[in-house]
Amino acid sequence: MTTTTHILGYPRIGEKRELKFAQEKYWRGEIDQAELKKVGAELRHKNWQTQASAGLSFAVAGDFAWYDHVLTTTLLLGHVPKRHRHGFPDLDTLFRVGRGQSQSSCACHGAAASDMTKWFNTNYHYIVPEFSKEDTFEVSWPQLFEEVNEAVQAGHNVKPVLLGPLSYLYLGKEIEDGFDRLTLLPRLLTAYQAILAKLAKQGVEWVQIDEPILALELEKPWLDAFKLAYQVIRSDVKVLLTTYFDSVVDSLDRIVELSVDGLHVDLSAAPEQLDAVLAKLPQNWVLSLGVVNGRNVWRSDVKAQLERLQPVKAALGERLWVASSCSLLHSPVDLELEAGLSAEVRSWFAFAKQKVSEVVLLGKALDGDAAAIAQCEAYSQPIQARKSAAHVHKATVQSRVNAITAELAQRSVPYAERARHQAEVLQLPLLPTTTIGSFPQTSEIRVQRSAYRSGQLSSAEYEQALKGHIADAVKRQEALDLDVLVHGEAERNDMVEYFAENLAGFQTTQFGWVQSYGSRCVKPAIVVADIEREQPITVGWSTYAQSLTSKQMKGMLTGPVTILCWTFPREDISRKAIAQQLALALRDEVSDLQDAGINIIQIDEPAIREGLPLKKRDHQNYLDWAVEAFRISAASARPETQIHTHMCYSEFNEIIESVAALDADVITIETSRSNMELLKAFEEFNYPNEIGPGVYDIHSPNIPSEEWIVDLVKKAAQKIPVERLWVNPDCGLKTRNWPETEAALANLVSAAKRLRKEFAKETTAVNSEAVADVETEA
């Protein structure tokens, strides 16, 4: 009885980010579409060959995306937003939806990108589908079928992957009032019928249909819709219904009624669901168990997994499939490239290519292969050795964590009193202007960093080069007349990796890249041991920048929850414990910054919402310790020290109480893509502190006009008192170039100055009316 082995998807970016570099060359006009497509084809074939050479039963097709797999599905379904429809959809259409289109690049007066948000509780972003009640769907984008043909012609046994109809609808949003997007399901199912019919004609036996929303706490109408949907799209192609990121026990009674041929569940995220799934699994279904974690870099304990799976194999026989927990999109590509790792550390890890081999090894061992069983034993030994390593578990760190009290997470005085102290010290105007922290990482900076790391630049030479970039950033900001400056973060390759490189307990990699969105990739550090700060990290750069200007300089820190969410965490201790260790380290940095004369310190927490568990019943426990971690890091600040925080792409309604509980003096948020909709949560909650709603989208190359910014700030002022508003971009400017940055910021500053005058006139007029009323009454 041969065990079927497969994965849910493979990284699409290439082991050295080949796709990223090709995309960006294409966008700059340096290569044509044919050259870009050639790079994509080469990556796909290499990925399929990796899977086939390892011995997987299937090669996955349809997991490749030019920007995002949800956006690919949008084009597959002929569902392009109207503002981006210019003839038959092509690759440029896809990029317009994802990136937007400036007025200067077309005759259509520009078109905004679609919203982008987090993919469940990961750091991957997807482009949000837009729905209106007149929408129709038609299969018009051939990418999936072309890639199936490519794989078949290359000799692979293909399993296409497709985002399911209910998840596609659920992950989108209505763009007009008065209708429920679920009413579009019958029309959408017609398109899915056509897709499956085409795949059947191509000879496909199995298709993987991803319905990750089944791991959520779905409302009854959504859950009930599944039965009809899968009856309607039933075809000659066998369907593996795929779920991941959490347990599906809540939805299991509905799932087992569906017209499908198998179910995949994520045992890495929710191992406790196995017994319930086995008890209710239909007799004719296969069961795919995701036991190799697709979201991390840790070597799988295949010995333990084998022992766990053997009884399931005995019960199900060939109906048991072994798989990755989710797509390996969330893992780096290949550990073999990491020449700089010690043998011990290397033995702890497995990247996507190695995880494929783990899946295959488990399949062979389950089939009784004696050599594979012995290999499982040997492969798991480093995991056991790590459990007792003294350099992993540090007594000094444990002692400090154990001493945490409620008082440690409390600022010395309430916000209202702090605000008075800060107003006296900072002397800022109405609608103060600032940026979120980073400035363009120019090619010169990247070349110098590379030269330093390769030994071509000495430490002293590199430090002088960085000081030059900092001085340049300060000079540009002063010329723009921004109110609160930043040093620009030239010394940081990444907002998390930089801290990981300067805190004990982390391991960084050279090629550990994963996709964040579009062409943007991140290289998460790995928490390998207890975390501690051995010396100041940012103080020298911030104080140097402050010495160059009489304006206020913001210190820039990445918060404990974001560092946790944007790194690969340990599996042997809780996320809460890691967050506490990080908070204590950052608390020391806050103390040193203010002692060095930095009066404003930003502790970025853009990832705080994405850390939420998928089940709402688990939210409060997470939010309690996440808020505590932030407060521990900030609470060493004196009353006159203003603490800022920044959050990205967050839907705040369900966490607004916890956002307020952070007790940051100023919060900056991304709001421009949502046209200030996100501020409703702050308005309804009567959020008491200061807010900087982002007034332009830094993820798009479009430069906002002064009028655009004025309009957004006025909308914000309808929801938040103007005296508590700041004016700033949505996010850091690292990925933009200097001409774009300066043009946008010039419009931002001029908009703020114009609005100060307008609001001052309104205040004067109101005061005059009040005086006149008093005189009349007299």
Swiss-Prot record:
It is an enzyme of class 2 (transferase). The keyword Cytoplasm does not apply. Its EC number is 2.1.1.14. L-methionine binds at residues 436-438, 489, 604. GO terms for biological process: methionine biosynthetic process; methylation. It holds the Pfam family Meth_synt_2. Zn(2+) binds at residues 646, 648, 670, 731. L-homocysteine binds at residues 436-438, 489, 604. Its cofactor is Zn(2+). Keywords: Amino-acid biosynthesis, Metal-binding, Methionine biosynthesis, Methyltransferase, Repeat, Transferase, Zinc. The keyword Flavoprotein does not apply. It catalyses: 5-methyltetrahydropteroyltri-L-glutamate + L-homocysteine = tetrahydropteroyltri-L-glutamate + L-methionine. 5-methyltetrahydropteroyltri-L-glutamate binds at residues 17-20, 118, 520-521, 566, 610. Coiled coil: none annotated. It comes from the Bacteria. Binds 1 zinc ion per subunit. One of its GO terms (molecular function) is 5-methyltetrahydropteroyltriglutamate-homocysteine S-methyltransferase activity. Pathway: Amino-acid biosynthesis; L-methionine biosynthesis via de novo pathway; L-methionine from L-homocysteine (MetE route): step 1/1. The active site is at 699 (proton donor). Catalyzes the transfer of a methyl group from 5-methyltetrahydrofolate to homocysteine resulting in methionine formation. NCBIfam families: met_syn_B12ind, PRK05222.1. Belongs to the vitamin-B12 independent methionine synthase family. This is 5-methyltetrahydropteroyltriglutamate--homocysteine methyltransferase.
